[in-house]
């Protein structure tokens, strides 16, 4: 699936194309897509294809086309504080984007069939938290991934506000999927070759909307153990944040609010331009020679004459460097990090407030 929009040169251009084609229609979804670079979830040797509107698969690792993820994110109608279940969570790309919208008091669970893909998703999540420039701009609901068949979820599991299934669902499993939803919840899944949005309007009432035609690999049927029993998937219990974690969120939130107020008043931090020290160059000199009361102006050879070609070449290099600096965007400044590091606190507490991030 995919190919509905033009390829981009980078992640932002891909998002621009998805917006222009009306696949991305809301600000929250746009912000989430821009915050996480799709290429970060590709293997290094395949990253050149990351900004094409195409699905990608390598072994068990799979990413749907950007236009599909866009429609899914829009159909889920995500809001802060909701609970989300991703069936077939794969690389964790979608779950991480969802986590940016859910915020710190949401629930973000994923079930993945293949254990190697679960580990891949955990590695990508760790890299995002440690190194992404976007992490400090959001309050993140960190995904939790478990391995298992999503058709074998324990019957006593909690229900969710939002559910997405990333594999083709047959009619026989429709009721099973619906029962994972709370009343008022939304389920998005490929049902009989159509991306379908189902809203639970009551204990036994549903509204169904077909979004677009899609082609997904079907759900893998459960394998019975030797005893004939199913291997039930136990989803993570809803986590209760510690007082220490809540204090971290409150402090970071206070700093962010102060920064927004300063920016509104025009007193926020700004990137300071970098100035390059001018190079001092020796110049050729006119030498005055006195001969028998007659004055002659003569240009006497100076060692610097031999460097005239070098000077011209250096001039050209400086012009090229200035041009490159003018066209190259300045690296982003993490103002939140700067503020935290200036707090009158012990270093271990500062690093805790920064989630021990590398930048």
Curated annotation (Swiss-Prot):
Active site: 64
Ranges where the record places region AdoMet binding motif: 85-94, 160-164, 181-191
Compositionally biased intervals (Basic and acidic residues): 314-328
Location in or out of the cell: Cytoplasm
BC-box: annotated span: 240-250
Keyword field: Cytoplasm, Lipoprotein, Myristate
CUL-box: annotated span: 343-346
Lipidation (N-myristoyl glycine): 2
Key word Lipoprotein present: yes
Gene Ontology CC terms: cytoplasm
Record-linked InterPro entries: PCMT, SAM-dependent_MTases_sf
SUPFAM superfamilies linked to this entry: S-adenosyl-L-methionine-dependent methyltransferases
GO BP field: protein modification process
Primary localization class, coarse: cytoplasm
PANTHER family listed in its UniProt record: PROTEIN-L-ISOASPARTATE O-METHYLTRANSFERASE, PROTEIN-L-ISOASPARTATE O-METHYLTRANSFERASE DOMAIN-CONTAINING PROTEIN 2
Function summary: May act as a substrate recognition component of an ECS (Elongin BC-CUL5-SOCS-box protein) E3 ubiquitin ligase complex which mediates the ubiquitination and subsequent proteasomal degradation of target proteins. May bind to the methyltransferase cofactor S-adenosylmethionine (AdoMet) via the N-terminal AdoMet binding motif, but probably does not display methyltransferase activity.
Family note: Belongs to the methyltransferase superfamily. L-isoaspartyl/D-aspartyl protein methyltransferase family.
UniProt comment concerning the protein's domains: At its N-terminus, contains L-isoaspartate and S-adenosylmethionine (AdoMet) binding motifs. Also contains an extended SOCS box motif, where the Cul-box is separated from the BC-box by ~90 residues, within its C-terminus.
Protein name: Protein-L-isoaspartate O-methyltransferase domain-containing protein 2
Organism: Mus musculus (Mouse)
